[in-house]
């Protein structure tokens, strides 16, 4: 090649790979009178041929003409489009709006009338109808309540609320599984008068074992096996007094009740084998009223609240009384029952001029 031929650069080689090469010619090598004078001429040089990739094409599908497709005929010569009555316009169907609304509106369900609410207590249904308030004389006779508690219990008994409690209790009693027996439900009121109460020990509900519940919280009749929770109470007394509290021969706490210790459960009945089965029967309304009245009337009391249920049951007390809280003595709790409530209660009573309780049992 001539000297004027330029060496192809990397860019030129790149163009060559694409099938086009460039040859740049200097203006001096161009002949005079040539129209390409005084300018750079770029001539394409064929490179390696690159065949284009053929593109596959398919012929357009032919679909049958739609009957409602627009036609090229004049509007006057077109055939009218037939519509179903459901899709006809308002000008074609006079009942168009009614049909559309009937199709769009959902079917209305018939209203369901729920029965009035019911109160279920221990498997017994108590309707919420208004009941006549029972008389104090009838209740005291049926349950064997002494007259010394009339001033406190009569206002709580002669109410429609307690009438519903009695209705629930009478319904549950038909099964024969209610503990304790009816003559022992108010046994806590037989051993001391209201003005003699100086210590209150609050329990949850009676023992659900046949023969254990006899109307006093935590207590069992003579001859019955001492329950585990009561054994832990005796162990706490042993820690407080040492040899001054020998192991009792039974779990009966009647000796405490005769000294003014009110052993009161929050709920007065239970179904056999089902703890806390009568919590919705309404006994707690009556027992709370008893504690509230005693707290207002009595000058000085020590109230022992063991467990969350007892603490929430008696939220407040007048400052003249001593409030003692601790975990429940049940064996299901991990915390040991090592409270010293018995010593603290006696100290509080003696400071007020009252006689201390003899916790020792026969």
Swiss-Prot record:
Q: Does the keyword DNA repair apply?
A: yes
- Which Gene Ontology cellular-component terms appear in the entry? host cell nucleus
Q: What are this entry's molecular-function GO terms?
A: uracil DNA N-glycosylase activity
Give compartment(s): Host nucleus
Q: Which InterPro entries match?
A: UDG_fam1, Ura-DNA_Glyclase_AS, Uracil-DNA_glycosylase-like, Uracil-DNA_glycosylase-like_sf
> Is-annotated flag, keyword Membrane?
no
Family annotation (SUPFAM superfamilies): Uracil-DNA glycosylase-like (SSF52141)
Task: Describe the reaction catalysed, as an equation.
Answer: Hydrolyzes single-stranded DNA or mismatched double-stranded DNA and polynucleotides, releasing free uracil
Which biological process annotations from GO are given for this protein? Answer: base-excision repair, AP site formation via deaminated base removal
Which segments carry the region annotation Disordered? 28-97
Q: Which residues form the active site?
A: 205 (proton acceptor)
Record-listed E.C. numbers: 3.2.2.27
What keywords is this UniProt entry annotated with?
A: DNA damage, DNA repair, Host nucleus, Hydrolase
Family to which this protein belongs: Belongs to the uracil-DNA glycosylase (UDG) superfamily. UNG family.
Function statement? Excises uracil residues from the DNA which can arise as a result of misincorporation of dUMP residues by DNA polymerase or deamination of cytosines. Therefore may reduce deleterious uracil incorporation into the viral genome, particularly in terminally differentiated cells which lack DNA repair enzymes.
Full protein name: Uracil-DNA glycosylase
The root-end lineage is: Viruses, Duplodnaviria, Heunggongvirae, Peploviricota, Herviviricetes
């Amino acid at each position: 090649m001539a000297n004027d031929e330029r060496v192809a650069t990397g860019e030129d080689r790149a163009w060559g790979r694409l099938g086009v090469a460039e040859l740049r010619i200097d203006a001096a090598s161009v002949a005079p009178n040539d129209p390409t004078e005084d300018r750079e001429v770029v001539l394409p040089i064929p490179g390696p041929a690159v065949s284009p990739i053929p593109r596959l094409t398919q012929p357009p599908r032919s679909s049958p003409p739609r009957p409602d497709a627009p036609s090229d005929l004049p509007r006057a010569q077109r055939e009218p489009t037939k519509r179903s009555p459901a899709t006809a316009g308002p000008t074609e169907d006079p009942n168009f709006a009614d049909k559309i609304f009937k199709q769009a509106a959902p079917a209305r369900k018939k209203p369901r009338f729920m029965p009035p609410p019911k109160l279920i207590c221990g498997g017994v249904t108590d309707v919420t109808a208004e009941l006549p308030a029972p008389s104090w004389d009838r209740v005291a006779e049926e349950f064997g309540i002494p007259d010394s508690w009339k001033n406190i219990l009569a206002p709580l008994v002669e109410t429609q609320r307690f009438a519903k409690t009695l209705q629930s209790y009478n319904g549950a009693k038909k099964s024969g599984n209610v503990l304790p027996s009816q003559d022992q439900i108010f046994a806590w009121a037989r051993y001391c008068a209201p003005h003699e109460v100086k210590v209150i020990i609050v329990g949850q509900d009676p023992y659900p074992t046949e023969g254990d519940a006899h109307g006093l919280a935590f207590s069992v009749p003579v001859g019955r096996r001492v329950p585990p929770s009561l054994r832990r109470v005796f162990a706490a007394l042993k820690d407080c007094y040492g040899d001054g509290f020998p192991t009792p021969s039974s779990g009966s706490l009647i000796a405490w009740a005769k000294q003014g210790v009110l052993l009161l459960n929050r709920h007065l009945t239970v179904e056999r084998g089902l703890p806390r089965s009568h919590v919705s029967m309404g006994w707690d309304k009556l027992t709370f009223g008893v504690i509230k009245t005693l707290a207002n009337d009595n000058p000085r009391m020590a109230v022992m609240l063991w467990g969350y249920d007892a603490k929430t049951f008696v939220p407040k007390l007048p400052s003249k009384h001593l409030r003692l809280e601790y975990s429940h003595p049940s064996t299901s709790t991990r915390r040991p029952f090592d409270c010293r409530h018995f010593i603290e209660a006696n100290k509080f009573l003696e400071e007020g001029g009252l006689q201390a309780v003899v916790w020792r049992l026969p």
